[in-house]
A protein has these predicted regions:
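Conserved beta-strand-loop surface patch within small alpha/beta domains used
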Residues: 1-88, 97-161
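Histidine-centered nuclease catalytic patch
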Residues: 94
Length: 161
């Protein structure tokens, strides 16, 4: 399902920003929304409901940093979403510096991957906040890959309530 706008409640933004500031390492989070209507159709708005911070283990190597989330944890989140009639529609994670380009590892380890999903990469381990309109890169999942939004598109489509 593709949306025109993603409406982000203050509680979801604050919980995400807090999770990102917990340590000087990469952190991953998921935003959920209610399951509504035709999953192949388009809806005007996604009303985000929750920030889910999975149990995760940070890693570092000469090639970069990452977090690993066990399959059982991802299954737990999906079952919880099912019980709540929600769906994971946005994945977010931090990068150590200002470079928020989507890496090949980001593509290989995508968690939320349906068409219309978002992947948001926040700079500096979230030290400056989420920076959704002026620092983070926002990507939208298309059939074959992720499409980078412009800063203008992010400002118009990500609505902080």
């Amino acid at each position: 399902m593709s949306y025109q706008r993603w409406k982000i409640p203050p509680s979801v933004a604050a919980e995400t920003a807090h999770a990102f500031r917990r340590g000087q390492h990469e952190v991953f989070a998921i935003w959920t929304a209610a399951v509504l209507g035709d999953p192949q159709g388009a809806s005007a708005d996604a009303d985000l409901l929750r920030c889910v911070v999975p149990d995760q283990a940070p890693g570092v190597a000469a090639t970069g940093v990452w977090v690993h989330i066990q399959g059982q944890e991802l299954q737990r989140i999906q079952l919880d979403n099912y019980r709540r009639r929600e769906r994971s529609i946005v994945q977010l994670h931090t990068h150590p510096g200002a470079d928020v380009r989507m890496s090949q590892l980001d593509r290989d380890w995508e968690v939320v991957r349906h068409v219309g999903a978002l992947s948001i990469i926040v700079p500096l381990y979230g030290a400056g906040g989420l920076r959704l309109h002026d620092g983070a890169n926002v990507y939208e999942r298309e059939a074959d890959d992720w499409r980078l939004w412009s800063r203008t598109e992010a400002a118009e489509r990500l609505v902080l309530e």
